[in-house]
Amino acid sequence: CIDSLDTYSKRLYEKYLLRCIVGQTRDIEKRAIESNESVYDTIISAHTNLGELIALRPGEKFDIDKELIDAINSITNKETKLMKTGYGSVDKFSGGLTRGEITIIGGRPGHGKTTFLINLLSQMIHSGLKVVFFNRELPNSEMIKKLITLESGKLSYGMVRQGIYDDSEIDELKRVKSKIAELYNEEKFLMFDNIRDFARSSTEVSKFKPDVVMDDYIQLVQPSGHFDSRRLQIEQLVNDYKWLAKEHECAVVLASQLNRSVEYRD
């Protein structure tokens, strides 16, 4: 009953705010048509009136007691948001990937960003975690060839890419095919090479609800609007990914190409 009352009260208050908006817009329209004041004074007045409506929005609640209890319970129950990367040196200093946070892998072309992500992907899948991988640069077919090389340990990438095998290597290829089909099934792994923008990427994350999201690489994501500089575009994308990580309680790993200017710093 209390929940129903709270819901009804919230809806009633929202209806009141909508009526206020209608009233304010009528006043703004009337003032714009009939007033002899300058257009800038009219704009300032409209901005002020709408700002007053924004102030009527109920504030967000923060319960320190609840947050403290949740934190203590998490500690005592040894619950953790960390996921091991499989890289000992990384796990030693960071503990691994963290749910609700992003990790950015930066490097110049050819420095192994994609290779690092593929190894990280393998570690996550072998740990039983769900992963979404966005390929902005390579087609899925090439990524699969890299996975075959990684999961085999016997077949080289050049061999797989060129299709040069003998009978024993064909047997190994069949074995790896079965292994990958079992491990990287559609319930645990999705990979896209045809999604250009963040909005569609976010939609796929919302539907799949992964533990880890990987994006290789973010400079190739199509911007959602106009930006005065590439830097502002990347900042907005990183912010969008930060909120996505928090909303879905997943870890996000982004590969990013470093600006050449870093090579000339003192």
Residue ranges and their predicted role:
Residues 59-154:
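The Walker A/P-loop phosphate-binding site
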Residues 214:
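Walker B beta-strand of ABC/ABC-like P-loop ATPase nucleotide-binding domains
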